[in-house]
């Protein structure tokens, strides 16, 4: 998947993505797994890629996202990724097996590099 992104694949993420990414970095720093300077380099390098943040999904938080989170017993964060892929007809990439199963049940195609 990383190679596809490097090669210029379109990447679309829900609005929560930036906060999830920052949280991951902050937790890793707190646990001394990564230095703040490394986080800064990572974020700078990430800017080189075209990543579209879909703000429209926020409009569906109280309906589709909530329904999918309940139905598939996922977090609202996970359900926001499902909602985005379903609404925009995008393939779905994850290593989370239960999330992948939920995507399959929704008829969302898996990402094929």
Model-derived regions, located:
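Short beta-strand scaffold positions
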Residues: 13, 76, 93-94
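Acidic catalytic patch
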Residues: 15-18, 38-71
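Short, well-structured N-terminal submotif of metal-dependent ribonuclease cores
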Residues: 1-17, 28, 32-41
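Alpha-helix capping/helix-boundary segments
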Residues: 17, 60, 81, 98-99
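Acidic, PIN/NYN-like endoribonuclease modules and their adjacent C-terminal/linker elements
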Residues: 82-113
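Short amphipathic alpha-helical interaction patches enriched in hydrophobic/aromatic residues
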Residues: 25, 29, 50-51, 69, ...
């Amino acid at each position: 998947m990383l190679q596809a992104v490097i090669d210029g694949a379109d990447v679309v993420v829900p609005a929560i993505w930036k906060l999830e990414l920052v949280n991951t970095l902050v937790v890793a720093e707190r646990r001394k797994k990564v230095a703040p300077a490394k986080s800064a380099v990572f974020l700078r390098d990430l800017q080189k890629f075209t990543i579209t943040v879909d703000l429209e999904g926020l409009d569906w938080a109280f309906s589709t996202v909530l329904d999918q989170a309940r139905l598939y017993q996922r977090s609202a964060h996970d359900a926001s990724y499902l909602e985005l892929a379903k609404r925009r007809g995008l393939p779905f990439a994850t290593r989370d097996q239960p999330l992948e199963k939920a995507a399959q049940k929704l008829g969302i195609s898996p990402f094929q590099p």
